[in-house]
């Protein structure tokens, strides 16, 4: 089992799929990484040499923001919005949808489970 960016990637899968187990790397980024390192897309992780794994690791460390660093930056961006007091920050602070969705009905994912209100039943 190869370990890249602090994540154990599965050995029996294709490298293109296995790289997507790393937070911050999707299908496009995984294909770009393999293209830079010149590894065929259909090769499996257990067929990679240690040198190839090292090359992949170096490309990811150099060019991509992944795992904890990406989560930290995302959290800091949200915290910055909340500290500014802008509209998006207020919506984050109140736990409401940020991107203009309606809240009169729906938005249950963001608002949490419905609260019972006495006298609402007919």
Curated annotation (Swiss-Prot):
Keywords: Ribonucleoprotein, Ribosomal protein, RNA-binding, rRNA-binding, tRNA-binding
GO CC terms, sorted: cytosol; small ribosomal subunit
PANTHER family documented for this protein: 30S RIBOSOMAL PROTEIN S13/40S RIBOSOMAL PROTEIN S18, SMALL RIBOSOMAL SUBUNIT PROTEIN US13M
Family that this chain belongs to: Belongs to the universal ribosomal protein uS13 family.
HAMAP family given in the database record: Ribosomal_uS13 (MF_01315)
Subunit structure: Part of the 30S ribosomal subunit. Forms a loose heterodimer with protein S19. Forms two bridges to the 50S subunit in the 70S ribosome.
Name the record gives this protein: Small ribosomal subunit protein uS13
Organism: Rhodopseudomonas palustris (strain TIE-1)
